[in-house]
C-alpha cells in the first residue's frame, strides 16, 4: 500500500499556548500535592490508552471472586460508551435507543445527577466515552451532524460546542496539554483548544476513523479505517508516518515504552510498531477478528478477539504468554482492563447475532484463569444482554454500562461484617478483713511503774486479685 499524504491540512497556533499549558500543569501539581485520587478520565484510562489503572489497591486476585452488584441504574438508552470517573461522579453516554445524552451519576449510589443536552432528540447517537479534566466533560454526539461538547462536570451546563464535518463521530476524545483531539468517520482529525473549542489544527486523511486517537510523547496515533496506523505530530498535525494494515480497523492503539500496539480485524492479528519510526516490530496471529483495543502493562499486551478468547503476549517479542477461552463462541466488543493483577473484560454476542453472553469476567492477569463472572444485566426473561462497553475500575469498584437495556452496573465487595468486641466482666473487689484490736495487757504490782506497751497498728488492706 502506497504512502498516503493528508488531503488537506490547516494549522493554527494560539498565542497563549504556553500560558495555557503552564496553568494546566500547575493545577495538576496542586492536585497531586493535595492528595487527590487519580481518577479514570478517558477511554482506556488515559490519553495513551493503556487500559490500566495503576492506582487500584482494593480489588486483587485474592478477593475478586467476591464481587457483587452494588447498584444498577437504567439511563434509558443502550451504551457503547464506557464510563469515566471524576471526583465522585461517573460519566457515560447513551448510544441512541433513547436520545443520545451524556449522563452523570453518583458513583456511590448510582443516582442520576444530570443529563445533557436538554434539547436532545430521539435518534441522536452518542458513541464516545467522555474525557474529563479540570471540571469539564468532553464528548461527541451525532445530531445527526457530529457535535463535540464541553460540559461543566458539576452542573451539566454547556461550556462550548464545536460542530464537526458532515460525517459521524464514533471515536472517543483524547485530552492532554490543553488540547482536545477528536476524529470523524470522513477521515478528519482535529485538535481543539480545550478551554474554548477553537480549532488549533485540522487534517483530513483518506480511510476514515472509527478507532480513537491515542496521544503520548508529542505524537498522536490512530488506526485509520481502511489504510493503517497513522502517526501525527500532536502539536501541528503534520504526518509523521503511516504503517499499512489491512482494513477495516476498529481497534484503538495503546502506547507504552516506545511501542504502539493495535489489533487488526481482517487478518486476525495483533501488531506492535516502533512509536518513532512506524516500523513493524512483531505481529501475532489470533483465531478470529480483533476489534478490541489492547491493555498494556509491565511488558505484557492483553487483547480479546471475536471467538471469545483472551490473549497475553510479551510486549517486546510478541511471544504468547497465555491464551484463555473465556467465552467461546461470543465476540468481545469490550476491551480488556487491567488493575492490580486482575484483567476485566465483558462479552457480547455470538456470530449469528442470536445469543448474548452479557457477562463481566475477571481473570488472573498472570495465568488467564477466570476468577469471577456474572451478568452485567438481565431482561425480564432472565436472558443476558449485550455488553459492548469496556470495564472501568476505580477504588475497589468495577463500573460497566450495558448496551442491551441501558443500565449502568457497579460491582464491588461487600463491607466486612464488624466483629463484636466482647465487654470485659469486672472482677469483684474483695472486702478487707479488719485487724482486731488486741486486749489490754494486765499490769503486775511493780516496785516501779513500767512504760506502757504501744498499741499495734492495723494491718494493710489486701489488694484485690486481677
Q: At which residue positions do the language-model features occur?
A:
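Extracytoplasmic/lumenal domain signature
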Residues: 56-78, 84-126, 131-170, 174-422
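Extreme N-terminus of proteins, especially the signal/transit-peptide cleavage junction
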Residues: 16-17, 30-38
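Bacterial N-terminal signal peptides
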Residues: 22-32
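Intrinsically disordered, low-complexity serine/threonine-rich segments
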Residues: 6, 22, 37, 156, ...
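Sequence/structural signature of beta-propeller modules
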Residues: 36-61, 416-417
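N-terminal secretory signal peptides that target proteins for export/translocation
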Residues: 1-17
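Ser/Thr-rich, Proline-interspersed low-complexity disordered segments
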Residues: 32, 407, 415-465
Amino acid at each position: 500500500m502506497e504512502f498516503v499524504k493528508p488531503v488537506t491540512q490547516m494549522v493554527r497556533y494560539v498565542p497563549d499556548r504556553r500560558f495555557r499549558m503552564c496553568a494546566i500543569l500547575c493545577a495538576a501539581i496542586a492536585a497531586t500535592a493535595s492528595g487527590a485520587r487519580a481518577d479514570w478520565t478517558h477511554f482506556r484510562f488515559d490519553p495513551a490508552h493503556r487500559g490500566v489503572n495503576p492506582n487500584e489497591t482494593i480489588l486483587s486476585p485474592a478477593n475478586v471472586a467476591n464481587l457483587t452488584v452494588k447498584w444498577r441504574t437504567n439511563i434509558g438508552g443502550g451504551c457503547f460508551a464506557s464510563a469515566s470517573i471524576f471526583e465522585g461522579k461517573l460519566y457515560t453516554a447513551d448510544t441512541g435507543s433513547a436520545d443520545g445524552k451524556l449522563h452523570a451519576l453518583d458513583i456511590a449510589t448510582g443516582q442520576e445527577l444530570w443529563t445533557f443536552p436538554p434539547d436532545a432528540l430521539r435518534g441522536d447517537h452518542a458513541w464516545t466515552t467522555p474525557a474529563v479534566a479540570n471540571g469539564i466533560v468532553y464528548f461527541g454526539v451525532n445530531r445527526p451532524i457530529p457535535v463535540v461538547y464541553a460540559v461543566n462536570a458539576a452542573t451539566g451546563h454547556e461550556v462550548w460546542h464545536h460542530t464537526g464535518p458532515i460525517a459521524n463521530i464514533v471515536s472517543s476524545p483524547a485530552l492532554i496539554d490543553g488540547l482536545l483531539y477528536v476524529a470523524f468517520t470522513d477521515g478528519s482529525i482535529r485538535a481543539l483548544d480545550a478551554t474554548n473549542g477553537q480549532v488549533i489544527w485540522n487534517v483530513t486523511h483518506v480511510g476514515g476513523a472509527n478507532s480513537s486517537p491515542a496521544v503520548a510523547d508529542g505524537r498522536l496515533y490512530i488506526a485509520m479505517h481502511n489504510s493503517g496506523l497513522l502517526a501525527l505530530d500532536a502539536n501541528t498535525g503534520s504526518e509523521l508516518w503511516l504503517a499499512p494494515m489491512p482494513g477495516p480497523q476498529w481497534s484503538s492503539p495503546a502506547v507504552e515504552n516506545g511501542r504502539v500496539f493495535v489489533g487488526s480485524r481482517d487478518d486476525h492479528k495483533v501488531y506492535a510498531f516502533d512509536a518513532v519510526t512506524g516500523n513493524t516490530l512483531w505481529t501475532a496471529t489470533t483465531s478470529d477478528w480483533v476489534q478490541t483495543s489492547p491493555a498494556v502493562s509491565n511488558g505484557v499486551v492483553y487483547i480479546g478477539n471475536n471467538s471469545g478468547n483472551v490473549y497475553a503476549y510479551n510486549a517486546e517479542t510478541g511471544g504468547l504468554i497465555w491464551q484463555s477461552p473465556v467465552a467461546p463462541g461470543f465476540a468481545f466488543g469490550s476491551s480488556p482492563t487491567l488493575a492490580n493483577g486482575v484483567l476485566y473484560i465483558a462479552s457480547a454476542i455470538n456470530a449469528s447475532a442470536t445469543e448474548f453472553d452479557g457477562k463481566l469476567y475477571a481473570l488472573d492477569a498472570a495465568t488467564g484463569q477466570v476468577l469471577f463472572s456474572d451478568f452485567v444485566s438481565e431482561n425480564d426473561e432472565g436472558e443476558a444482554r449485550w455488553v459492548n462497553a469496556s470495564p472501568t475500575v476505580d477504588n475497589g469498584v468495577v463500573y460497566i454500562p450495558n448496551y442491551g437495556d441501558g443500565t449502568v452496573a457497579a460491582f464491588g465487595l461487600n463491607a466486612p461484617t464488624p466483629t463484636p468486641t466482647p465487654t470485659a466482666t469486672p472482677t469483684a473487689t474483695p472486702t478487707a478483713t479488719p485487724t482486731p484490736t488486741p486486749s489490754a495487757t494486765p499490769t503486775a504490782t511493780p516496785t516501779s511503774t513500767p512504760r506502757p506497751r504501744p498499741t499495734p497498728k492495723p494491718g494493710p488492706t489486701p489488694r484485690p486479685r486481677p
